[in-house]
């Protein structure tokens, strides 16, 4: 045992070995934190969040966003070639309209459109169309207006081809109408921007995807008003046609559709206006025309460029609205005159008609 009164006495070997191993005199007691884990790399225990009845929607309860994303990814992976095949007829018809409208010299196109307006709605509308189209060309928006007109006419054509037979079928099948009507409600209330993301993923960008998204956005009115027009045909006329032995085909084409034509044309008018309202939104996916002018003007803070595009859209909308309203007039309001006896066509055919 070492003498405690002798300052020169040596410490035990165990103590000297401990001091040589730890020059700073750190205590050598065993750690009590459960295995000596490094406090720099250790993560704290997660706090368990309990459901709070006063704030029930603090966390997402239904992961709708992930479901939709996974669903669209699955559709893109498995059905993208199918949707790329849908592009073919749309692209073909759109290119045909663009070549027709852009291939004609502007003066020839203005005269042709003015004559068509005269034939459909009278000489006053013909003059208004002439002046309006000259104004579009004068402000420097002629080519963009023709591109927009081609896009709108293509979308309108497909809406009529799809919507008119579908409306006739739903008018004859109340059970199917109950199933389709909520879908039409959802299509009409969904914001237009929502359609852009899946359309871009399935079809890409450009004019053809712009036409597709316009068709989807503008389709419900023509379906709804076709159903309404056929259902509003007086029941006594239907009974009279049946009593005279009319077949279902004859009843449809000679009784129901002619009487429902004003309402159907109101649906065409609404579809056309929705298609024009989609022009600026569709320009966000690289769709050309007047909407692209408006978008570029907004992006550059160029009020003049945006105004030119906006004025062009307004003029086109007014012309097309008046023309579709004129087509939708009841034939009885025009009397017994045939279409080929009025307007510029009547000037050519009148000498040959007794």
Curated annotation (Swiss-Prot):
Which one of the record's GO molecular function terms can you name? carnitine transmembrane transporter activity
Q: Which GO terms describe its biological process?
A: amino acid import across plasma membrane; carnitine transmembrane transport; cellular response to osmotic stress; choline transport; glycine betaine transport; glycine import across plasma membrane; hyperosmotic response
Q: Which InterPro entries match?
A: MetI-like (IPR000515), MetI-like_sf (IPR035906)
**Residues annotated as transmembrane:** 100-120, 122-142, 149-169, 199-219, 271-291, 301-321
Per the record, its GO cellular-component terms are: ATP-binding cassette (ABC) transporter complex; membrane; plasma membrane; ProVWX complex
Q: What's the superkingdom here?
A: Bacteria
Recorded hits in Pfam families, A to Z, give: BPD_transp_1
State the UniProt keywords alphabetically.
Answer: Amino-acid transport, Cell inner membrane, Cell membrane, Membrane, Transmembrane, Transmembrane helix, Transport
* Signal peptide start-end: none
The family annotation for this protein states:
Belongs to the binding-protein-dependent transport system permease family. CysTW subfamily.
Quaternary structure? The complex is composed of two ATP-binding proteins (ProV), two transmembrane proteins (ProW) and a solute-binding protein (ProX).
Q: What is this protein called?
A: Glycine betaine/proline betaine transport system permease protein ProW
Q: Which organism is it from?
A: Escherichia coli (strain K12)
User: Its gene?
Assistant: proW
């Amino acid at each position: 045992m070492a003498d405690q009164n002798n300052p020169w006495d040596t410490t035990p070997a165990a103590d000297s070995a401990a001091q040589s191993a730890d020059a700073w005199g750190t205590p050598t007691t065993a750690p009590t934190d459960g295995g000596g884990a490094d406090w720099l790399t250790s993560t704290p225990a997660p706090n368990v969040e309990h459901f709070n009845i006063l704030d029930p929607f603090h966390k997402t309860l239904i992961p709708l966003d992930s479901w939709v994303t996974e669903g669209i990814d699955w559709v893109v992976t498995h059905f993208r070639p199918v949707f790329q095949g849908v592009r073919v007829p749309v692209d073909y018809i759109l290119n045909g309209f663009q070549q027709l409208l852009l291939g004609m010299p502007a003066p020839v196109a203005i005269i042709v459109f003015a004559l068509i307006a005269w034939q459909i709605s009278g000489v006053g509308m013909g003059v208004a169309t002439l002046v309006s189209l000259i104004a579009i060309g004068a402000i420097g928006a002629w080519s963009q207006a023709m591109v927009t007109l081609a896009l709108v006419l293509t979308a309108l054509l497909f809406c009529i081809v799809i919507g008119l037979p579908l409306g006739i079928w739903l008018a004859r099948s109340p059970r199917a109408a109950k199933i389709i009507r909520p879908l039409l409600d959802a299509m009409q209330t969904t914001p237009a921007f929502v359609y852009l993301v899946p359309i871009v993923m399935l079809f890409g960008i450009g004019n053809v995807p712009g036409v597709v998204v316009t068709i989807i956005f503008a389709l419900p009115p023509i379906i709804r008003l076709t159903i309404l027009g056929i259902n509003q045909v007086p029941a006594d006329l239907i009974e009279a046609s049946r009593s005279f032995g009319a077949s279902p085909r004859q009843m449809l084409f000679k009784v129901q559709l002619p009487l429902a034509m004003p309402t159907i044309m109101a649906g065409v008018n609404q579809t056309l206006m929705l298609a024009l309202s989609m022009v600026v939104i569709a320009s966000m996916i690289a769709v050309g025309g007047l909407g692209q002018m408006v978008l570029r003007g907004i992006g550059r803070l160029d009020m003049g460029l945006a105004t030119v595009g906006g004025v062009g859209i307004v003029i086109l909308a007014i012309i097309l609205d008046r023309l579709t309203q004129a087509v939708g007039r009841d034939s009885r309001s025009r009397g017994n005159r045939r279409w080929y006896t009025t307007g510029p066509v009547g000037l050519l055919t009148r000498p040959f008609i007794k």
